[in-house]
């Protein structure tokens, strides 16, 4: 599906928990018709301990949302 929304565009979220937010697009996933928007749909993800990060812990990461839930701002 062809989309007018590209990476680094400013978009407004029009549906979901983050409705009304204006933020930058971090990535566009054309195969699934989804976008990743900065600071929207943030989840807490557990990280297992590794050699680089011996304590493990949690990180906050943006999840993709459907492209129909955003419009260009």
Curated annotation (Swiss-Prot):
Tree of life domain: Bacteria
UniProt keywords, alphabetically: Ribonucleoprotein, Ribosomal protein, RNA-binding, rRNA-binding
PANTHER family: MITOCHONDRIAL RIBOSOMAL PROTEIN L24
Biased composition annotated in UniProt, kind: Basic and acidic residues: 51-65
GO CC term (a single one): ribosome
Complex and partners: Part of the 50S ribosomal subunit.
One Pfam match: KOW
Region (Disordered): 51-73
Gene Ontology BP terms: translation
Protein known as: Large ribosomal subunit protein uL24
Function, as annotated: One of two assembly initiator proteins, it binds directly to the 5'-end of the 23S rRNA, where it nucleates assembly of the 50S subunit.
An annotated Gene Ontology molecular function: rRNA binding
Similarity comment text for this entry: Belongs to the universal ribosomal protein uL24 family.
InterPro entries linked to this entry: KOW, Rib_uL2_dom2, Ribosomal_uL24, Ribosomal_uL24_CS, Ribosomal_uL24_KOW, Translation_prot_SH3-like_sf
SMART domains: KOW
SUPFAM superfamilies membership: Translation proteins SH3-like domain
């Amino acid at each position: 599906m062809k989309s007018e929304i590209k990476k680094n565009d400013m978009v407004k979220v029009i549906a979901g928990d983050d409705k009304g937010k204006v933020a930058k697009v971090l990535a566009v996933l054309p195969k699934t018709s989804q976008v990743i928007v900065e600071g929207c749909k943030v989840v807490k993800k557990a990280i297992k301990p590794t050699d680089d990060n011996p304590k493990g812990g949690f990180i906050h990461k943006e999840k993709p949302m459907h492209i129909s839930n955003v419009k260009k701002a």
